Amino acid sequence: VKDKLCSLGFEEFDGPLVETEFWDCDALFMPQFHAARDIHDVYAIKNPTHAKSIEEPFLSNVAAVHRDGGNTGSRGWNYNFDEHFTKHLILRSQGTVLSAHQLAKAKVPGKYFGIARCFRYDKVDATHLSDFYQTEGIVLGEEANLKTLLGFLEMFAVEIAGATDVKYVPGYFPFTEPSVE
C-alpha cells in the first residue's frame, strides 16, 4: 500500500503512538462531551497522565473554535473547553490524528498519507483486536472538492484493492459531513 501510494505522488506522514486528547479528538472539532467520543474508547496512559503543554497557537485556536467558533464564522459547541482534559495522554485511537498534525504544516497543493496503528478497547475475538491499522489520506488544493475525493477513492479501490466495480452510498459518521461509504 505504501509503495503504491508513493507511486501515485503521495508523501507519507506519521506520528507518535501516545497522543493527547487534544490531537486525537479536540483538534478534529469533536467536543469533549460528545457521544461520538464514545466509539473511541481509549487506553489512558498511567504515567505520566498528562502532557506538559499543547503547542500554540493550536491550543488557543482550537479552544476558541470549541467555545464560540473563534473567528471561523461557526457558533462552535458553546461550552467551556477544558484545557487540562485536552492534555490527557492516550494511545492513538484513530488515524485521523495524523491528518490533524499534518494539516498544521502541510503545503497546498499536496497529497499526503499515513498508515496508523491505532488502539481501542474492544472485546477480543476472532474478528476484533485492541489494535488495528488505518490508512489515512489528505489531498489539498484550491480546486479540490467532493468529486475530487470520490475520484481518488475510486482510484484507490481499483489500483490498491483491485476492485472491478465501485459504488458509493451515503454514510453517516457523527464527526464528518458529508460522509460516504
Language model features: what each stretch is:
Residues 1-181:
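TRNA-recognition modules of translation machinery and tRNA-sensing kinases, especially anticodon-binding
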